[in-house]
């Protein structure tokens, strides 16, 4: 009998070389290259760049059925999803991604950033390392599959819009898809990841091991930390992540980490699978993900550019004081910092306005603001600035609170690879 289960043969795991640099409170040793990033989820050409899972055994392959479907289940996509429970909605917002790199194939996951069912259009967020390889470059063909429609006949062609190795985020675009028109594809709802607390319950949903959509559950272990990793192009990157203990595997890359309401709190990106470590997965926080997706679509869609554009104030900041606060609503504790300016770059837009020693209390860009209690509140927020944007900082200087305003110029914009 013909095996109707696989579109591609099992392929071995292409592993992106990744090293985590521990904080000074730990041993400070690097980890083997299999330990952290899901190197394109699954694999390419059986290349194995280090110790770890057997590339021909448990490494994730693409388990897309090869059924020759040419129609849709009666009424598919026509019912209201209002009655769908929060957990099940995550299956409608998460997708399987299969990439072809020449004669090689690899798989991962993604989430719907936006969906236009009438026209069959959508934007999808995934990890940059899902669609890019140091050896092969950008995937020459990207296919997307929906939950319950993971067969070759339902493949949806997707286009790379833009992305960033540094942030490990990419945006894909789908246009005029009959599958989307006849599906329950649903755009994700973003939670405020700045309000995520340790012990919060989470669900990881994605294409684990390339075997199709699945879900696991766990809790948040660390709400925000920074990993030093070797990215998709071989360069060293610093990636801000949250840590969680839900089981994730090769193929989960780019998939969603959700809260109990089915809202996105992060994009699953990495894990630690060393022999003496259990249940340490990492996701890029949803607040950062949304800012990156907006930036990429604004600067890259239907343009020659495919890189993130980031405005730089030209100031160096540090956490001069750190501590804890108690959330009055939940009773949870969370970390806070005093964010202090320690250096100002010559010729920057902040020169002559911001001073060394200023404590940044809040930042506003074009009238949209936020309180600053962590350093990343400033650095991440700058992704929303455009040429001509007005930035207002409220700072404490000499015991007084003052507002400082300046405008983003073209010279302040840098391309982030």
Name the predicted role of every residue range.
Residues 30, 65-86, 139, 208, ...:
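C-terminal cap/linker of serine protease catalytic domains
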Residues 78-84, 96-125, 153-159, 187-189, ...:
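A conserved glycine-rich beta-strand in the N-terminal activation segment of trypsin-fold
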Residues 32-34, 115, 119-167, 176-177:
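Catalytic-histidine neighborhood of serine endopeptidases
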């Amino acid at each position: 009998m013909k095996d109707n289960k696989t579109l591609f043969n099992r392929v071995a795991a292409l592993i992106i070389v990744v090293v985590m640099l521990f904080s000074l409170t730990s041993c400070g040793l690097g980890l083997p290259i299999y330990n952290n990033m899901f190197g394109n989820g699954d694999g390419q050409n059986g290349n194995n760049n280090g110790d770890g899972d057997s590339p021909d055994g448990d490494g994730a392959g693409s388990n897309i059925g090869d059924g020759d479907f040419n129609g849709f289940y009666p009424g598919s996509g026509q019912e209201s999803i209002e009655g769908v429970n929060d957990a099940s909605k995550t299956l409608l917002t998460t997708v399987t991604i299969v990439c072809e790199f020449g004669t090689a194939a690899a798989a991962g996951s993604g989430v719907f950033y936006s969906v236009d069912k009438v026209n069959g259009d959508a934007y999808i967020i995934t990890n940059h390392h899902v669609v890019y390889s140091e050896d092969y470059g950008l995937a020459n063909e990207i296919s997307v599959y929906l939950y319950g429609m993971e067969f070759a006949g339902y493949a949806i062609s997707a286009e790379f819009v833009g992305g960033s190795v540094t942030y490990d985020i990419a945006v894909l675009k789908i246009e005029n898809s009959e599958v989307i028109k006849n599906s329950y594809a649903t755009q994700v709802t973003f939670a405020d990841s700045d309000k995520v607390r340790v012990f919060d319950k989470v669900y990881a949903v994605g294409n684990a091991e390339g075997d199709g959509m699945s879900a696991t559950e766990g809790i948040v272990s660390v709400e925000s930390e920074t990993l030093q990793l070797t990215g998709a192009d071989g360069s060293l990157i610093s990636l801000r992540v949250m840590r969680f203990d839900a089981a994730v595997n090769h193929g989960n890359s780019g998939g969603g980490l959700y809260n109990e309401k089915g809202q996105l709190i992060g994009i699953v990106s990495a894990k630690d699978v060393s022999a003496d470590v259990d249940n340490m997965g990492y996701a890029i926080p949803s607040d950062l993900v949304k800012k990156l997706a907006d930036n990429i679509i604004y600067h890259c869609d239907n343009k020659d550019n495919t890189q993130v554009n980031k405005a730089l104030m030209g100031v160096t900041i540090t956490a001069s004081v750190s501590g804890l606060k108690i959330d009055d609503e939940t009773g949870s504790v969370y970390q806070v910092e005093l964010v202090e300016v320690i250096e100002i770059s010559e010729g920057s837009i902040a020169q002559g306005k911001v001073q060394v020693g200023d404590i940044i209390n809040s930042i506003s860009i074009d009238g949209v603001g936020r309180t600053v209690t962590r350093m990343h509140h400033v650095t991440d927020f700058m992704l929303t600035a455009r040429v001509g944007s007005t930035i207002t900082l409220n700072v404490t200087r000499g015991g007084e609170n003052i507002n400082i305003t300046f405008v983003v110029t073209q010279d302040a914009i840098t391309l982030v690879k």
